[in-house]
């Protein structure tokens, strides 16, 4: 049994979740392909302060209404049979109830959900003895792979195209992620003392 660390937004939720909200709020017509940087202030031509004001007003409804990524549910249902599913997200802690309600509404299994309130997930990864992490944020993937010394499956997106470490595996969807995991399971099995 492996302890799988899994990000939420852009990993089990659709990567274009924010697009309709951004388009409506900022009177734009962007698509996911226009989001070539995780920092949306550049695309929106606004300051960090303006962005976080917008997030404070909108993130609860965005997370509440987020759609699942393609094949995420069936893949997670398969993985839960053999592994612990530990979700580690950058969401802030005031979103705890909305997060749990979303998981229940989507009927997504979890063994634990941790909202770390920022993009530094390494401490939580180490605390939970994660064997493999699933992520969409390039910076998080690099940090986890290097500092926690574990493989990271990085879900390909227009905003994470920077070069990657040898401990990071790019996939296009959940089917590819599960296939890679099944093909490499023997390398990942935790040695129990």
Swiss-Prot record:
Give EC number(s), comma-separated: 3.1.3.-
Q: Name one GO molecular function term.
A: hydrolase activity
- Name the UniProt key words of this record, in alphabetical order: Hydrolase
> Is ATP-binding among this UniProt entry's keywords?
no
| Domain of life from the UniProt record | Bacteria
* InterPro entries per UniProt: 5_3-deoxyribonucleotidase-like (IPR052419), HAD-like_sf (IPR036412), HAD_sf (IPR023214), Nucleotidase_putative (IPR009206)
Question: Kind of enzyme, top EC level?
Answer: hydrolase
Q: Which family does it belong to?
A: Belongs to the 5'(3')-deoxyribonucleotidase family.
Q: Please give the name of this protein.
A: Putative nucleotidase YqfW
Q: Which organism is it from?
A: Bacillus subtilis (strain 168)
């Amino acid at each position: 049994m492996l302890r799988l660390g899994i990000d939420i937004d852009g990993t089990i939720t659709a990567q274009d979740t924010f697009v309709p909200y951004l388009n409506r709020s900022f009177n734009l017509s962007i698509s996911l392909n226009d989001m070539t940087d995780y920092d949306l202030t550049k695309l929106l031509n606004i300051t960090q302060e303006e962005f976080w004001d917008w997030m404070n007003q909108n993130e609860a409804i965005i997370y509440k209404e987020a759609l699942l990524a393609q094949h995420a549910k069936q893949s997670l249902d398969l993985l839960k049979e053999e592994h612990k599913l530990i979700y580690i997200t950058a969401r802030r802690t005031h979103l705890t109830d909305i997060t749990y309600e979303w998981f229940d509404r989507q009927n997504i299994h979890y063994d634990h959900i941790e909202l770390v309130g920022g993009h530094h997930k390494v401490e939580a990864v180490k605390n939970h003895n994660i064997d493999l992490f699933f992520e969409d944020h390039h910076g998080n993937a690099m940090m986890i792979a290097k500092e926690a010394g574990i493989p990271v499956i990085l879900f390909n997106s227009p905003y994470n195209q920077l070069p990657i470490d040898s401990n990071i595996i790019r996939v296009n969807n959940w089917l590819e992620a599960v296939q890679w995991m099944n093909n490499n399971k023997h390398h990942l099995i935790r040695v129990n003392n």
